[in-house]
């Protein structure tokens, strides 16, 4: 399956009591699709997966699948640092009708490369769906090596990688050595254009909550051969891309959505709301986008 070029790692909306708000989920899905999203990643890092209970994740998967109704791929974040739990959640997500699976590198346990290979292989074995690997060493401590990614890419239903280690040399090595059917996605909004320039398929984006149409414009300009226009857009969008990460994700993107008039609630502990200074900075960045 082709997941598309601009995928959104969707926030999880909460109500005033901190419960998952499925009505807001529906509205958010429609908002994102109307603003250029070609695929939705549900219950990933941006969706606060570590603080969601399994029943909440399953309710999210089911709701998003129903609302999307096959318009774009729905990718379920089923990864954790417990291989058995991840595989079982993958089976349940598959039964709910999602289109793909995303699994993060196991955090805290600090597994070896061999351990990570076995972890992802077990998750892939639990489903017939395409699986996206997710490498984010800043959060998980371990870094999935290019060699291990290449080895995993030959498992038939491991078809893509969300790469968030920020290392373009590493990305080149992965793209060079994996099959043409295996796609690399930037896991950092600010590296979208550099990653595209070395052969990445697209981006799994947080900023697309706020600048979805502009992200699509940049993607289309690059793919259409207008690299100069794509570069101009990249430079224009870079401040908001960076600004959304001045506090632990998804703190700032939820605040930015609220500033723009779409309240998706707060974040769950141990995350805390942004400071007044952070909110003011986000307000400034959003206002700058309007006038630029």
Swiss-Prot record:
Protein's organism: Halalkalibacterium halodurans (strain ATCC BAA-125 / DSM 18197 / FERM 7344 / JCM 9153 / C-125) (Bacillus halodurans)
Entry similarity comment: Belongs to the DapA family.
Gene Ontology biological process terms from the UniProt entry: diaminopimelate biosynthetic process; lysine biosynthetic process via diaminopimelate
Catalysed reaction equations from the record: L-aspartate 4-semialdehyde + pyruvate = (2S,4S)-4-hydroxy-2,3,4,5-tetrahydrodipicolinate + H2O + H(+)
Places the protein is found: Cytoplasm
Top-rank taxon: Bacteria
SUPFAM superfamilies for this protein: Aldolase
Any one cellular-component term (Gene Ontology): cytosol
Main location group: cytoplasm
Active site per the UniProt annotation: 134, 162
Protein function: Catalyzes the condensation of (S)-aspartate-beta-semialdehyde [(S)-ASA] and pyruvate to 4-hydroxy-tetrahydrodipicolinate (HTPA).
Quaternary structure and partners: Homotetramer; dimer of dimers.
NCBIfam families for the chain: dapA
Family annotation (SMART domains): DHDPS (SM01130)
Protein name: 4-hydroxy-tetrahydrodipicolinate synthase 2
PROSITE patterns from the UniProt entry: DHDPS_1, DHDPS_2
Keyword Cytoplasm carried by entry: yes
Gene3D superfamilies named in the record: Aldolase class I
Enzyme Commission no: 4.3.3.7
């Amino acid at each position: 399956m082709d997941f598309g070029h601009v995928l959104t790692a969707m926030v999880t909306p909460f109500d005033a009591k901190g419960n998952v708000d499925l009505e807001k989920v529906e509205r958010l899905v429609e908002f994102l699709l109307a603003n250029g999203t070609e695929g939705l990643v549900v219950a990933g890092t941006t969706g606060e997966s570590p603080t969601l209970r399994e029943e909440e994740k399953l309710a999210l998967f089911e709701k998003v699948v129903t609302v999307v109704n096959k318009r774009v791929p729905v990718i379920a974040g089923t990864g954790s640092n417990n291989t058995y739990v991840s595989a079982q959640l993958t089976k349940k997500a598959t039964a709910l009708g999602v289109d793909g699976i995303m699994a993060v590198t196991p955090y805290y346990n600090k597994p070896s490369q061999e351990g990570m290979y076995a972890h992802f292989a077990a998750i892939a074995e639990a489903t017939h769906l395409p699986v996206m690997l997710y490498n984010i060493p800043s959060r998980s401590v371990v870094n999935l090596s290019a060699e291990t990614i290449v080895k995993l890419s030959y498992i038939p239903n491991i078809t893509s990688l969300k790469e968030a280690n920020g290392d373009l040399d590493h990305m080149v090595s992965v793209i060079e050595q994996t099959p043409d059917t295996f796609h690399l996605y930037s896991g950092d909004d600010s590296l979208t254009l550099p990653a595209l320039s070395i052969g990445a398929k697209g981006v799994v984006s947080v900023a697309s909550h706020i600048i979805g149409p502009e992200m699509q414009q940049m993607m289309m300009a690059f793919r259409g051969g207008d690299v100069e226009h794509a570069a101009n857009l990249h430079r224009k969008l870079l401040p908001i891309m960076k600004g959304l990460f001045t506090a632990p994700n998804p703190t700032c993107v939820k605040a930015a959505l609220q500033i723009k008039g779409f309240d998706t609630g707060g974040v769950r502990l141990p995350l805390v709301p942004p400071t007044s200074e952070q909110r003011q900075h986000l307000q400034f960045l959003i206002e700058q986008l309007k006038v630029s």
